[in-house]
């Protein structure tokens, strides 16, 4: 079904069965599969390929040569109808690739809202990405990676399968991430190592000074006290009742499956 207000260039191909919402713009030489749903106000500039099953929300802008919803690069994939779901108001720049999920996981790749994916960024199968994140040029997420809200992943960075990146993290360019990065942490390198709290980012996002100080205390307890991980968690737990931000930090540590960067 194509809404009457949608604008589709004569050279674009939209397969029968695709659902195209109000005020959608599909530019020259785009291809939209039959199992695709595109929400109101989204724009495909030109030469964009969208395969399905894929659902794209409202007011996204997808630039030329992006490949959205293609089958994954997992050798176990056998043609199953797995999904990609994208939220609202994302900017997806040139040559970005986003793949559908696998049945070995939950069968779905999820991208939240208000994210920026710069040129050549890659989102592999079964990734889960929050809201208001930035992925710089050539940032690469392997399969099953989870990224929290308002994280920044620097250019040319690569994140190993199953790693988790916490809320408000900032990864420097060229980082190789093979373990989980706790919330609020700045990290960089090969292999990626922590070097402090994303203080400036937290200030910009409205965190109070006392909250930031509490987060810094938790960081120092974890990384600079010389305590074991279990002992550090016990110390950090003492501030979780007063500071929900510290509680989030501790919960991340407790849930980590791959271990945290050190």
UniProtKB/Swiss-Prot annotation:
<dbReference type="InterPro" id="IPR037157">
    <property type="entry name" value="Acetyltransf_C_sf"/>
</dbReference>
<comment type="subunit">
    <text>Homotrimer.</text>
</comment>
<dbReference type="Pfam" id="PF00132">
    <property type="entry name" value="Hexapep"/>
</dbReference>
<keyword id="KW-0808">Transferase</keyword>
<comment type="function">
    <text>Involved in the biosynthesis of lipid A, a phosphorylated glycolipid that anchors the lipopolysaccharide to the outer membrane of the cell.</text>
</comment>
<dbReference type="GO" id="GO:0008780">
    <property type="term" value="F:acyl-[acyl-carrier-protein]-UDP-N-acetylglucosamine O-acyltransferase activity"/>
</dbReference>
<dbReference type="GO" id="GO:0009245">
    <property type="term" value="P:lipid A biosynthetic process"/>
</dbReference>
<dbReference type="InterPro" id="IPR010137">
    <property type="entry name" value="Lipid_A_LpxA"/>
</dbReference>
<dbReference type="GO" id="GO:0005737">
    <property type="term" value="C:cytoplasm"/>
</dbReference>
<comment type="pathway">
    <text>Glycolipid biosynthesis; lipid IV(A) biosynthesis; lipid IV(A) from (3R)-3-hydroxytetradecanoyl-[acyl-carrier-protein] and UDP-N-acetyl-alpha-D-glucosamine: step 1/6.</text>
</comment>
<protein>
    <recommendedName>
        <fullName>Acyl-[acyl-carrier-protein]--UDP-N-acetylglucosamine O-acyltransferase</fullName>
        <ecNumber>2.3.1.129</ecNumber>
    </recommendedName>
</protein>
<keyword id="KW-0443">Lipid metabolism</keyword>
<dbReference type="InterPro" id="IPR001451">
    <property type="entry name" value="Hexapep"/>
</dbReference>
<keyword id="KW-0012">Acyltransferase</keyword>
<keyword id="KW-0444">Lipid biosynthesis</keyword>
<dbReference type="Pfam" id="PF13720">
    <property type="entry name" value="Acetyltransf_11"/>
</dbReference>
<dbReference type="InterPro" id="IPR011004">
    <property type="entry name" value="Trimer_LpxA-like_sf"/>
</dbReference>
<keyword id="KW-0677">Repeat</keyword>
<dbReference type="InterPro" id="IPR029098">
    <property type="entry name" value="Acetyltransf_C"/>
</dbReference>
<comment type="similarity">
    <text>Belongs to the transferase hexapeptide repeat family. LpxA subfamily.</text>
</comment>
<dbReference type="GO" id="GO:0016020">
    <property type="term" value="C:membrane"/>
</dbReference>
<keyword id="KW-0963">Cytoplasm</keyword>
<dbReference type="InterPro" id="IPR018357">
    <property type="entry name" value="Hexapep_transf_CS"/>
</dbReference>
<keyword id="KW-0441">Lipid A biosynthesis</keyword>
């Amino acid at each position: 079904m194509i809404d009457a207000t949608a604008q589709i260039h004569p050279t674009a191909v939209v397969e029968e069965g695709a659902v195209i919402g109000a005020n959608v713009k599909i530019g020259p030489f785009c291809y939209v599969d039959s199992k695709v749903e595109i929400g109101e106000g989204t724009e495909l500039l030109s030469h964009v390929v969208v395969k399905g099953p894929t659902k794209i929300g409202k007011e996204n802008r997808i630039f030329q040569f992006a490949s959205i919803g293609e089958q994954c690069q997992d050798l176990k994939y056998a043609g199953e109808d797995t999904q990609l779901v994208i939220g609202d108001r994302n900017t997806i720049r040139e040559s970005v690739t986003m793949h559908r999920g696998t049945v070995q996981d939950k069968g779905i790749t999820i991208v939240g809202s208000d994210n920026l994916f710069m040129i050549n960024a890659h989102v592999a199968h079964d990734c889960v990405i929050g809201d208001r994140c930035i992925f710089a040029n050539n940032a690469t997420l392997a399969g099953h990676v989870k990224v929290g809200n308002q994280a920044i992943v620097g250019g040319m960075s690569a994140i190993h399968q199953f790693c988790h990146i916490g809320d408000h993290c900032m990864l420097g360019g060229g980082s190789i991430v093979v373990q989980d990065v706790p919330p609020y942490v700045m990290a960089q390198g090969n292999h990626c190592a922590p070097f402090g709290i994303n203080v400036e980012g937290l200030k910009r996002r409205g965190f109070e000074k006392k909250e930031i100080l509490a987060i810094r205390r938790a960081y120092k307890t974890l990384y600079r006290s010389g305590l074991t991980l279990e002992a550090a968690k016990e110390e950090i737990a003492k501030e979780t009742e007063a500071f929900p931000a510290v509680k989030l930090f501790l919960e991340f540590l407790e849930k980590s499956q791959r271990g945290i960067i050190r």
